[in-house]
Amino acid sequence: MQTFQADLAIVGAGGAGLRAAIAAAQANPNAKIALISKVYPMRSHTVAAEGGSAAVAQDHDSFEYHFHDTVAGGDWLCEQDVVDYFVHHCPTEMTQLELWGCPWSRRPDGSVNVRRFGGMKIERTWFAADKTGFHMLHTLFQTSLQFPQIQRFDEHFVLDILVDDGHVRGLVAMNMMEGTLVQIRANAVVMATGGAGRVYRYNTNGGIVTGDGMGMALSHGVPLRDMEFVQYHPTGLPGSGILMTEGCRGEGGILVNKNGYRYLQDYGMGPETPLGEPKNKYMELGPRDKVSQAFWHEWRKGNTISTPRGDVVYLDLRHLGEKKLHERLPFICELAKAYVGVDPVKEPIPVRPTAHYTMGGIETDQNCETRIKGLFAVGECSSVGLHGANRLGSNSLAELVVFGRLAGEQATERAATAGNGNEAAIEAQAAGVEQRLKDLVNQDGGENWAKIRDEMGLAMEEGCGIYRTPELMQKTIDKLAELQERFKRVRITDTSSVFNTDLLYTIELGHGLNVAECMAHSAMARKESRGAHQRLDEGCTERDDVNFLKHTLAFRDADGTTRLEYSDVKITTLPPAKRVYGGEADAADKAEAANKKEKANG
């Protein structure tokens, strides 16, 4: 097994991983940085993000407003000190991206343009047409090429991390092009591996988003936090799950049922706004969890449209006009034509909620470090405490760069002070990784990884979807336990050493099953409804701050069982209150302003 010596290893070369690598290179120009990715960096899932990235940019906006929107949007399960750090650093990172070449869309006067996004009181979403993720990733990738100390290991699949006496010491990866193993020694490792959306049947995620980093951390005793909170995006294309960005609604698109009725006004997000005049926190610009839940209610009422690919509602953009659509949403027009045969200029787009984002992830502190010294996690694979029970759109792209930078700087500092590990113990671990791989390749049985993966996706959709019941969640838990047993009998039929996808998909499935069990058990144990976790059983349909204003921590014990613990939520300045949107939110804002004025007048 070849060995490469580095100071810092970063797993994942999407937005978070690239930003961490750049920050590390800037913090210590002499540091050797290994950047490992199972795909070429520009194929990372960040490239699929369309809508935008949040940062205060206008005089009538403020850090306080962004903080409030994020905490309320997360249904008060956010770590408020983390949110405060985040909102204050977003503008700096957006400006830095521009200095590196990110082509933010502009107003006629040359100032940066910002669009409305759901759950936000004021428009603060920076965007580059409707390919924001692509432009951010391209900017970060080309910037990273300026630093020769960043050595890329493209198309390398990380099999496991190496840990000695509570401190990370490196990792073992497979060179997918050759089928050989490489040991990368480093005294700090940053996980930037993305979410776990592929454990669901229909999702907006790329094929690489399989929960690998979460699974590796879990196997070393690091808990996954708040895994019951999985966001459904309200507007995915039926069948494919391809995303129709929230920017569509930010520009003025509307959602209608089979009767042409704008149904969101019936679910606490009204009154109805004028056509083509979107209003922050109203109607289509409500938070994603509530907009997705409204679809479910319309489906139950029989107000959705039946199609061969499932029930849908319509996203109508026609009133925006051809010029605006081709200027602001050109990619959306292309996608709608290619995947559902619809020209948004002339017809409404069929959409339905689709699994989109993992709010939970690898538990970290406010500096992105886990319980294992030197092991950091950032981006969607992590739970730093930013999103709580429901993420606001455009906060995630900003999270990649704000916390990517922080993780890179902190990991560089940790690596410089780590000392040396037990060489014999580390080598023994690496040999163990190699042996487990051989055992998997030679495993005998009649099971097929693809069939197990499909059954997992269906089970997660049925039991851990938009609305949940104890019966369906238990059915999912039982099914996952069955699939875990069947996974032990998966047979790998491809014997090649070069790009053996049969082997790689099997390894991904193993991580996915472990992560899915954390999601299902965490959901069953949270006997309340909060954010993206909504229950229908009696006594659990409302938020319960007395018993469940706390984080769920899911551990995987040595015998394969999922064990749950809980930790407190950090509340600093904004105590829990009712989440309100639409006219109710305006009334609450007016009452708060009047109260402040009265106090000021003494």
From Swiss-Prot:
Positions of the UniProt region annotated as Disordered: 581-602
At which positions is FAD bound?
12-16, 36-38, 44-52, 156-158, 192-193, 212, 356-357, 380, 391-397
Q: What happens when the gene is disrupted?
A: No anaerobic growth on glycerol fumarate medium.
**One GO term describing the cellular component:** plasma membrane
InterPro entries, sorted: FAD-dep_OxRdtase_2_FAD-bd, FAD/NAD-bd_sf, FRD_SDH_FAD_BS, Fum_R/Succ_DH_flav-like_C_sf, Fum_Rdtase/Succ_DH_flav-like_C, Fum_red_fp, SdhA/FrdA/AprA, Succ_DH/fumarate_Rdtase_cat_sf
Coiled-coil region: none
Tree of life domain: Bacteria
Q: Which residue intervals are annotated with compositional bias (Basic and acidic residues) in the record?
A: 587-602
Q: Which gene encodes it?
A: frdA
The organism is Escherichia coli (strain K12)
| PANTHER family according to UniProt | FUMARATE REDUCTASE FLAVOPROTEIN SUBUNIT, SUCCINATE DEHYDROGENASE 2 FLAVOPROTEIN SUBUNIT
Q: How is its activity regulated?
A: Inhibited by oxaloacetate, a substrate analog.
Tell me, how does this one assemble? Answer: Part of an enzyme complex containing four subunits: a flavoprotein (FrdA), an iron-sulfur protein (FrdB), and two hydrophobic anchor proteins (FrdC and FrdD). Can be cross-linked to SdhE. Purified from membrane fractions associated with protoporphyrinogen IX dehydrogenase (hemG).
Task: Return the similarity comment.
Answer: Belongs to the FAD-dependent oxidoreductase 2 family. FRD/SDH subfamily.
Question: A single Gene Ontology molecular function, please?
Answer: succinate dehydrogenase (quinone) activity
Name this protein carries in UniProt: Fumarate reductase flavoprotein subunit
The reactions it catalyses are: a quinone + succinate = fumarate + a quinol; a menaquinone + succinate = a menaquinol + fumarate
Provide the cofactor note recorded for this chain's UniProt entry.
Binds 1 FAD covalently per subunit. Flavinylated by SdhE, about 5% flavinylation occurs in the absence of SdhE.
Q: What is its EC number?
A: 1.3.5.1
Annotated consequence of substituting residue 248 to S/A: Does not inactivate enzyme
**Cofactor(s) required for function per UniProt:** FAD
Q: Which UniProt keywords apply?
A: Cell inner membrane, Cell membrane, Electron transport, FAD, Flavoprotein, Membrane, Nucleotide-binding, Oxidoreductase, Transport
Which residues are reported to carry the modification Tele-8alpha-FAD histidine?
45
